[in-house]
């Protein structure tokens, strides 16, 4: 007997829905989804009646298009070039269609007013664009909790504990570099991007979770790849209507991978947390001072003061923030130095003198002024994002020049001032001594340091919207580069130009980046 096609179709739909309900029983019924979809349409109609931005949209939807998909894809592919082209000639804001909707991008001249506006929320951006309400995005759920525990730990503990972790961090970096880069004294081509990424992953995790997990290959794999999986899944979900995302994320392979990584991270971390808590309770019961560990597990416990927090989510968020941004600046800094070989010996002399006399301390890292200047210049020439400090408007916002941003829309600041010839002489030129000279001026010495921010250099954002982990990243990068420059000779691979990976707001060193290297007969 032949079964009608429509009957088969209905059965398949029923089976598919049953499978979804089995794996996600909390999902709403089909009737609820239809009702929700109609409500969404109604809300969209009501929202469209509100005041709109009168700014020009650079990549508008064509009149015949039903969706903004083409515009979003074109922004993903062309955003850095578009933003640079517009703001190099115009000191006026502009609107774009990005993967999460409309985004008003402001010129850097408006950054000072922007950064002070409490109506513009970075946490809202992180929670919305990285789907903090969905399983697998547990790191962003912890980041956006009202307690803001992660921000407190990064801003307070990573600063006050620097004297305790700098030397252990240097020792870990030294051993890791020997393991990854080896002792080959012949010139050879090295996949420097991949090797530096592994180096950063291992040194970051050493401070984040301590010695035991920092040498656990399974944890290192999660730390290294979870951020990539999360970024891919977040981007894919942003292309779907909001109401469908709670369903779609259960059906996509990246979503399953993301949730598996979180589950395994919990399984690896939880025994260590419980062991330390039991150890502390036992010591206190015996009137003994509990041991204190120099890692962020300890600092989260101290800062939480007994209040619940998601320990695994916190650590995954720290890895997301601390590995790839740090790697990009470190690799970019190394490549720029190698592209200007006359820099290598002055840098080695500085490292020998400072570290040789004072050892590994926060104070000695501060004195690596040429290395600091090189890194800040690398960040100026190639910022990691072409527009930064993204935030959502919690209410309608009007800037002093009349620029209007509707409630619920995204706002960012272009990095145009970092390449403005009126601010920086010869802005296209990599000048490694640029910020070293500025440090000689008492009025500019503070902002000329890598870890400090101002309106002329927003590579780390601008306080209070600056990257809170920049102080730790600065120390870590200097330690790693000091070892790499002293231990190895470097040169460019012939006929292999430097490449960047440009996608949406990001401008990053290409993963295929390679350099030539060989071991030297010197060490720190």
From Swiss-Prot:
The chain crosses the membrane at residues 26-47. It comes from the Eukaryota. Monacoline K acts as an inhibitor of HMG-CoA reductase involved in cholesterogenesis. Its hypocholesterolemic activity might be useful for lowering cholesterol levels in the blood and reduce artherosclerosis and coronary heart disease. GO terms for molecular function: heme binding; iron ion binding; monooxygenase activity; oxidoreductase activity, acting on paired donors, with incorporation or reduction of molecular oxygen. GO terms for cellular component: endoplasmic reticulum membrane. It is a single-pass type II membrane protein. Residues 1-25 are cytoplasmic. InterPro entries: Cyt_P450, Cyt_P450_E_grp-IV, Cyt_P450_sf. Its EC number is 1.14.14.124, 1.14.14.125. Keywords: Endoplasmic reticulum, Glycoprotein, Heme, Iron, Membrane, Metal-binding, Monooxygenase, Oxidoreductase, Signal-anchor, Transmembrane, Transmembrane helix. Its cofactor is heme. Glycans are attached at residues 396, 401. One of its GO terms (biological process) is secondary metabolic process. Heme binds at residue 467. It catalyses: dihydromonacolin L carboxylate + reduced [NADPH--hemoprotein reductase] + O2 = monacolin L carboxylate + oxidized [NADPH--hemoprotein reductase] + 2 H2O + H(+); monacolin L carboxylate + reduced [NADPH--hemoprotein reductase] + O2 = monacolin J carboxylate + oxidized [NADPH--hemoprotein reductase] + H2O + H(+). It is found in: Endoplasmic reticulum membrane. Residues 48-524 are lumenal. Induction: Expression is controlled by the monacolin K cluster transcription regulator mokH. Belongs to the cytochrome P450 family. PANTHER family: CYTOCHROME P450, CYTOCHROME P450 MONOOXYGENASE AUSG-RELATED. This is Dihydromonacolin L monooxygenase mokC. It comes from Monascus pilosus (Red mold). The gene is mokC.
